[in-house]
Amino acid sequence: MKVKLICVGKLKERYLKDGISEYQKRLSRFCQFEMIELTDERTPDKASFADNQLIMSKEAQRIHKKIGERDFVIALAIEGKQFPSETFSELISGVTVKGYSTITFIIGGSLGLDSIIKKRANMLMSFGLLTLPHQLMRLVLTEQIYRAFMITQGSPYHK
């Protein structure tokens, strides 16, 4: 199984890079994990609605190029479905049973995701109503993916 994490913007903070790197190492026992960082568009301070739509559209084009035709896509969006870690684990396990070999997670830029990406997604997922920095969300999501595999294995990691 392959797990891809497509992110808009570059990860800058060293502590986040270190945390993600640790979970990438741990995940290598279960899957091929790949994090793809895409260039984000600069948003002007007083951007209009049209400016924001154009920015999201440009980012969506970059994202779309990295999604495989047969990928099971989970896009992170505030309006997405929320569920506990156990259900998330079942979801990941179930994707392979449905014949998918790649799960692709998408974290958008500071403006969120364009509707074209949300429509392409097989599922929209939310970690709640809190707003988290997109770079921190990468670490949280990577840990949850690892936790999902550990739950499937019956590991005491998840208590």
From Swiss-Prot:
The stretch of residues making up the signal peptide is none
Q: Which reaction does it catalyse?
A: pseudouridine(1915) in 23S rRNA + S-adenosyl-L-methionine = N(3)-methylpseudouridine(1915) in 23S rRNA + S-adenosyl-L-homocysteine + H(+)
> Which amino acids does the record list as binding S-adenosyl-L-methionine?
L76, G108, F127, G128, L129, L130, T131, L132
Keywords carried by this UniProt record: Cytoplasm, Methyltransferase, rRNA processing, S-adenosyl-L-methionine, Transferase
> Matching SUPFAM superfamilies, A to Z?
alpha/beta knot
Q: Which Gene3D superfamilies match?
A: 3.40.1280.10
Q: Which InterPro entries match?
A: Alpha/beta_knot_MTases (IPR029028), RlmH-like (IPR003742), tRNA_m1G_MTases_N (IPR029026)
- EC assignment: the record states 2.1.1.177
Primary localization = cytoplasm
Under CDD domains, the record lists: RlmH-like
A single Gene Ontology CC term: cytoplasm
- Family classification: Belongs to the RNA methyltransferase RlmH family.
Q: What NCBIfam families would the database entry show?
A: PRK00103.1-3 (NF000985), tRNA_RlmH_YbeA (TIGR00246)
What is the annotated quaternary arrangement, including any partners?
Homodimer.
Q: Could you tell me what this protein does?
A: Specifically methylates the pseudouridine at position 1915 (m3Psi1915) in 23S rRNA.
HAMAP family per UniProt:
23SrRNA_methyltr_H
Q: What is this protein called?
A: Ribosomal RNA large subunit methyltransferase H
Organism lineage string: Bacteria, Bacillati, Bacillota, Bacilli, Lactobacillales
